[in-house]
Amino acid sequence: MVHPVQVGKRTRMSFSKIKEVCEMSNLIEVQLDSYEWFLQEGLQEVFDDINPIQDYTGNLSLEFVGYKLDMENIKYSVEECKERDATYAAPLKVSVRLINKETGEIKEQDVFMGDFPLMTEQGTFIINGAERVIVSQLVRSPGVYYDVSLDKSGKELFSATVIPNRGAWLEYETDSNDIIYVRIDKTRKLPISILIRALEYGSDLEIIDYFGEDERLKASIEKDNTKTKEEALLEIYKRLRPGEPPTVDSAMSLIGSLFFDAKRYDLSRVGRYKFNKKLALHLRIANQISAQDIVNPATGEIVVQEGEKIDRDKAIEIQNSGINSVDIQLDDKVLRVIGNNFVDIKSFVKFDIDDLNIKEYVHYPTLKEILDNYSDEEMIKEQIKKNINVLIPKHIIRDDIMSTISYEIGLPYGIGYTDDIDHLGNRRLRSVGELLQNQFRIGLSRMERVVKERMTIQDQDSITPQALINIRPVTASIKEFFGSSQLSQFMDQTNPLSELTHKRRLSALGPGGLSRERAGFEVRDVHHSHYGRMCPIETPEGPNIGLINSLATYAKVNEYGFIETPYRKVDKATGVVTHDIIYMTADEEDHYLIAKANEILNDDGTFIDDKITVRDQEDVLVVPKEEVDFMDVSPRQLVSVATAMIPFLENDDASRALMGSNMQRQAVPLLKPEAPIVGTGIEYKAAVDSAVLPKAKKPGVVTYVSASEIRVKKDKPDSNGDVDKYKLLKFKRSNQGTCINQKPLVSKGDKVDTKTVLADGPSTDLGEIALGKNIRMGFITWEGYNYEDAMLISEELVREDVFTSIHIEEYEAEARDTKLGPEEITRDIPNVGEDALKDIDERGIIRIGAEVRSGDILVGKVTPKGETELTAEERLLRAIFGEKAREVRDTSLRVPHGEAGIIVDVKVFTRENGDELSPGVNKLVRCYIAQKRKISVGDKMAGRHGNKGVISRVLPEEDMPFLPDGRPLQICLNPLGVPSRMNIGQVLEVHLGLAASKLGWHVATPVFDGATEPEIVECLEKAGYEGDGKTVLYDGRTGEPFDNRVTVGYMYILKLAHLVDDKIHARSTGPYSLVTQQPLGGKAQFGGQRFGEMEVWALEAYGAAHTLQEILTVKSDDVVGRVKTYEAIVKGENIPEPGVPESFKVLIKELQALCLDVKVLNDDNEEIAIKELADDDMVELEVNIEGSEDYTEPKQPNDNYLEEEENKDKESDYDEDLNFDDLTKGLQLDDFNDEH
């Protein structure tokens, strides 16, 4: 039943039935851990891979010995970086050793290798002052993949692909004649036997001897016209290098460099792990009948007799005794199964080798050689260390290739299985660390080329490491990654939840991933392996659906990049569900039966029911309780954080839940945040991990609290003194222009622990996420103002500032050097009256606190005009008045159209103060304008269940429907928005909200484990309401009751970032496009509304000829006509006849460009001369109604947000996650040095 739960400083009444067994880990650890790995191991791996760099003679060799990030010399703090548009980074120092092998001379030096961007505690990077997030990428894991397709007759054809991390692909395929072909690196196909001959077994006999008798192999050999190893090598060389003279040696070295050279072919740790897992012998021989006695080669004892079934443990024992091929008996034939010769080192080396840190299987022949030649423990360890790259090879080896062929031969007989490429066991994450590592590797390999060249050119004796190394390629590739990679995105900072979600996002796009166009339905679809790893609900609508996902709440990423999810182990002996938590990847989970988290348990932890519903891969089965292997840890395990914040999610249709998840991320932080009455209990965790709240670093006592600072005296003083200071952010601008403001929660004398929340941030209330407001509402129509999801709101919401938010915009002006002299920031602006300068100080910059409207001057700036040859009089004036009379024009920064507000901050950067400015800039001024935006007609609002709508009317409070106790409703929603959309969760939320508000509760109803219908009825009755949650409503205008009782209660409603003030737009005259001379389009360009083809039809249909003519000419692109019209309107005369539209001239020119002789004739068939340029007719006007095409409103720095908003409205299927970085598509590195 309902029970109190302490969440931070608030007590919630929880309806959950299931006790939490597993702590949710830090929600942004996927970012933090990955970057930490990169600093500790990732960088070292790259240096190890490239060591040593030798010149072409092999005489000089350059080695990277070690590296460190110089944390002492970080130039600016995070806050300063944001202010100064700098990058938050630390200098990377690498110690380099240069060895001259002829003279034996060794030189060591520390080389500076550029500033390396650091991750902030929040899991973000500050790049050029903008906060960015690196999104994790979901890619296909390297490994061996088998696939099956059917030919025309319905026969199964098996194919395989061997995919490395980088390097040449191997593909096998079978045709209808049972011949197996191979393609090497996407070339034309060859019979498989050619590859086998070239690698090892030259003659037909050897091949059959090795692989065993098989019809398909024999058919392939027949097809093959080579008979020896040499012929096969030449054949392959001809295919791979057509046109070059083939020789056996060059063919050998070609194959060697294609597959067996670690520099060219890299499997990576994951690849090796997946290869060994797929090609392991024991998986294919388990549960098969042995066709002969299997003898352990070391002891000589028989492990399995002929005709005996090989069980799983025996199979593993056989593999780990070094046996690599086993014959198994099928119905009417014997099949040979060949592994890839990798074994568990622990079954051979009996002493402790944990310090060697070997987690993978090792290559048996190499290990055997070491063990045969050495017996001493230390020597064996030494040899293992020395040969680690042969024991665990980074590239593919012959044994791997032979094993993949053997697997292909066994598939038609049901030995082995085909793979599903959308399974999360075959897709992995590249997080920040790995993406950075790959980028760094590209930079280093470019640098390596430079070093080699310099080694050969420079004088061998005077050479130093510093002189050899050019760090430009390295710093450039890092800069390129952070600045323009598709995966480095401008952080979505609308509210704490959107920040958190952005850091937990998984994208299948980006370099080396999929492209939107190529991605089919299967990749985007929900897969059974997503359970507990990736949210099936949260994904954008539009072209990116299913390609961009969100990490589930409990998911973790393992060392190989596979996503794991926790399960509770069921003790098979006693039937008890233990508290042992085991994290499993998707392919491990496939072997087990897993019970749901809400399965009821006895007090001793055993299942109550005898039959249990379990998941088995994609099926749901009912099995006896003895067969269950694991159990989910929590019902919210399968969804993401945003989805877990929707109460009664189980009662909503999935597509509406998707909208609900996505719209919570667009909620604007309000002036007075208010936590939801009906929450799910995850609000506190989400807020604490989203990094918008200051948390205590060490336990202690609060000694000082002000609006901007909190000081905590630590219980145990350490090297940083005994007081921790926490600076609070006050009215800062977020990336999206919302307001970031923190206010203290603790008071003087409070005791705090580690991680105690000290202050509330934007959209948080007592440390819980608070995106919206609890609003008293009813499902009732009102005079048609609810039509099509519109919302009717009470004036109270405007008056009481319930939905008021603060928005801060940033504008900047820079004074540059021009060809004609420097620009100047000054109060002295030509042709501007004193009235316009009333709020401008003596520097020419607006004062803080001034109220500004559109068109007001923010920064006065003048630019020198082109000087003409001066006359004698002018020269005299110059001599008398000095420079004052110089020709300048006004280029001041003004408030753009439709913007207004109060100046809250002004920052000035100059060269004299030692600020770093971009070249040619002498002074930079930034102004911040804040606006309070009250809720108004046209704003978009939404609940948490995908029930969105636009405000249609603000009604006086006294006209709103009111309850029997006299309280008026605050919002009326349309009841028709519920049944067809099937998001019943909103109705249950309203009922529970009504009861909870009366009882004074805040409730938690976790997803899939929340309040049931009887519980809600009980709560309503406890609060003194009817069990159905309906009540009589009275019309506010007449006082009469409405005919039927109405559902009334409290719903949590959000105000979304689509505000009408940002969208409304009007234009009289403005900029025109250069070629067609038609007005530009869009708010950002201050454009006009297009009167398009269909609108023209409408006017034609009405026969409105004159209206149509002026719309197509003087109102659009008749250049002369529109100027004359403007003049006529100003002078009050009649509007003149229109001329020829510019676009008509363009059309004629286009036809002439196609070599068509086009003339324009009048009624009498006389040619009309069309003037090329309208300048002859141009009337000199006082008014400039022209604007140049490149006119745009002054841009806010790092903020393409307005345009994004603009495009959101243009496309109905707008994609929320298409970051504006996608504009830099052209710069993509298509893959990591990889042709595929």
Curated annotation (Swiss-Prot):
It comes from the Bacteria. Residues 1185-1236 are annotated as: Disordered. One of its GO terms (biological process) is DNA-templated transcription. Residues 1201-1220 have a biased composition (Acidic residues). Signal peptide: none annotated. InterPro entries: DNA-dir_RNA_pol_bsu_external_1, DNA-dir_RNA_pol_su2, DNA-dir_RNAP_su2_dom, DNA-dir_RNAP_su2_hyb_sf, RNA_pol_bsu_bac, RNA_pol_bsu_CS, RNA_pol_bsu_protrusion, RNA_pol_Rpb2_2. Its EC number is 2.7.7.6. It catalyses: RNA(n) + a ribonucleoside 5'-triphosphate = RNA(n+1) + diphosphate. CDD domains: RNA_pol_B_RPB2. Pfam families: RNA_pol_Rpb2_1, RNA_pol_Rpb2_2, RNA_pol_Rpb2_3, RNA_pol_Rpb2_45, RNA_pol_Rpb2_6, RNA_pol_Rpb2_7. GO terms for cellular component: DNA-directed RNA polymerase complex. Keywords: DNA-directed RNA polymerase, Nucleotidyltransferase, Transcription, Transferase. GO terms for molecular function: DNA binding; DNA-directed RNA polymerase activity; ribonucleoside binding. Gene3D superfamilies: 2.40.50.100, 2.40.50.150, 3.90.1100.10, DNA-directed RNA polymerase, subunit 2, domain 6, RNA polymerase alpha subunit dimerisation domain, RNA polymerase Rpb2, domain 2. The RNAP catalytic core consists of 2 alpha, 1 beta, 1 beta' and 1 omega subunit. When a sigma factor is associated with the core the holoenzyme is formed, which can initiate transcription. Belongs to the RNA polymerase beta chain family. PANTHER family: DNA-DIRECTED RNA POLYMERASE I SUBUNIT 2. DNA-dependent RNA polymerase catalyzes the transcription of DNA into RNA using the four ribonucleoside triphosphates as substrates. This is DNA-directed RNA polymerase subunit beta. The gene is rpoB.
